[in-house]
Amino acid sequence: MSRKERRKEPALAPKEQVELSQKNIPLRIVLVVLALVAAAVCFANALGEMGKVQPGWQEILATNPITAASQNFVLTYNLGAGSLSPKAEQQKVSELYTRVLDETSQALSNQAVSGVNNLHTLNRQPNADIQVEPELYEAFRVLENAGSRMAYYAPMAEQYDALFSCTYDEEAVQFDPQRDKAAGEFAARIAAFAKDSAAVQVRLLPDNTLRLEVSQEYLDYARESGVETFVDFGILRNALLCDAAADALVQAGYVQGVLSSLDGYARSLNGEEFALNIFERQNGKIKNVGIVNYSGPAALVSFRAFPATESDTVNYYTYSDGTVICPYLN
């Protein structure tokens, strides 16, 4: 091919200029708007279906995820059985359930809570009259009416509870009153004080006022032994919380539910029949050996001397010889 020969360009189709009609632009705008409206309606319907609450038995979640209601309790409720819609009933039950458990939990706590005169306040000011939260006053009233002095074994229970955070037997044994002499002597001394109303007693005074009366002998021993807690609810704590929440729900007319704590307390609020599973440890394995059926409003307690689930293990200690220590003093 000659250098001077010109390269042939491919033949291109001739360009044609087309003018768009301006007649249908308003119609197009209307169609686009209608399409957007239809899409918005479909999206809203989809969201409505997602947020729709179905009637029937459902777990009621706490409004606050960092709360006693979501960490230690389960509330199942028959939504829509009353006059309210399932969604409205779910919201009202959840708000009341969460609020009562939060307030009662703070009142019964042995940790300082800003602006709350709770159990911690009472323990830090023995022999003083203190106006406390109504929930704390009610808890001591319940124990007094029941003739229970379990709350006064708090120092012993506090030492015993330390056993369950241990990893090795050598650590655990120093908190075990059955295996360690010093721990046994401490437990015996605290038990003697706990049984004696002249040594320690919570007095119920008017206007939600409590006085934690502690004898001079007990105060001296507490100072020498590093005891700062004279009263605490221990394993009764969740029972008191469960009753407080259940009573509040019933008083507000919400009775279509069952409230239970993870450590074995339960309250049925209505006449529905419900079942309680019975477990037994056989040859190192956990087996469901039966079911107990109940009907009508009832309060139930189910304790186990062994861990049944992986999450249970933090509340028990198993020695290398196979002995299981449960969280209940006897």
Task: Report the location of each language-model feature.
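Mature catalytic core of soluble alpha/beta enzymes
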Residues: 2-330
